[in-house]
């Protein structure tokens, strides 16, 4: 008899067929849907979004594996999963290059004021030669500081070093030999990173240690010409402090793909600022990469429920 699983995000037809080959699949339009009878027999879940916590696990007593179509897993209570022995799988490898491309897009858009200038053109303000009030700042040869040198940080460093001849600084728990050898990256403490970076690129996940890691005190240590880029998690940055810094000119601009509350409320003060480029958390949102993420998540669930896990496991201790 096939294991029962819950699918809570639509996937391509071929991927759905693969799930059907291995499992008895119940597809939910809403999740977590605690009152749905499929939870009682589900051994696996696959999708993205929705909270998986102790309450959910009480309604899914047979759950053995959860496969999220994402790198981030902050919607999962990992401690609760560990207590129940539930394997949590994610997709950390397939979106690296696409998210790194998004970082460069945010850097260029913020530095060259692309969104602001486009809106001015559409509003009919381009009536002749452009003056300095239309100017942006260069990206090439500027110093990039990367906060968190994981897969995405390394891919950003590659683009910055080879594509824009940028000196690379980084702050991480340990030295990254590949970054230092290939891109001449320099490991430094956080204060040095803040003080010397023209672009501060945040790639960190959200943890107790990284929550509001960048606040008013840290922003004050940055250059007035600096641009902050965040594609990690919104709450790594204190949004109130960031808004204040952007209004006061403590830093020049920000390019943001992640926010504390998503979708970003329409009354967020960040949306009123011309020096903010705000994206709707689309760092990995290309047709190719989203397909690859879903395919990886399907493979992950099959591996987890067949006892064949070799990679992409968030909590490998439950495998022992």
UniProtKB/Swiss-Prot annotation:
One of its GO terms (cellular component) is plasma membrane. Gene3D superfamilies: NAD(P)-binding Rossmann-like Domain. It catalyses: glycolate + NADP(+) = glyoxylate + NADPH + H(+); (R)-glycerate + NAD(+) = 3-hydroxypyruvate + NADH + H(+); (R)-glycerate + NADP(+) = 3-hydroxypyruvate + NADPH + H(+). SUPFAM superfamilies: Formate/glycerate dehydrogenase catalytic domain-like, NAD(P)-binding Rossmann-fold domains. Its EC number is 1.1.1.79, 1.1.1.81. Its main location: cytoplasm. The keyword DNA-binding does not apply. It is found in: Cytoplasm. The active site is at residues 233, 262, 281. The keyword NAD applies. PROSITE patterns: D_2_HYDROXYACID_DH_3. Keywords: Cytoplasm, NAD, NADP, Oxidoreductase. It holds the Pfam family 2-Hacid_dh_C. Catalyzes the NADPH-dependent reduction of glyoxylate and hydroxypyruvate into glycolate and glycerate, respectively. HAMAP family: 2_Hacid_dh_C_GhrB (MF_01667). Homodimer. Belongs to the D-isomer specific 2-hydroxyacid dehydrogenase family. GhrB subfamily. This is Glyoxylate/hydroxypyruvate reductase B. It comes from Pectobacterium atrosepticum (strain SCRI 1043 / ATCC BAA-672) (Erwinia carotovora subsp. atroseptica).
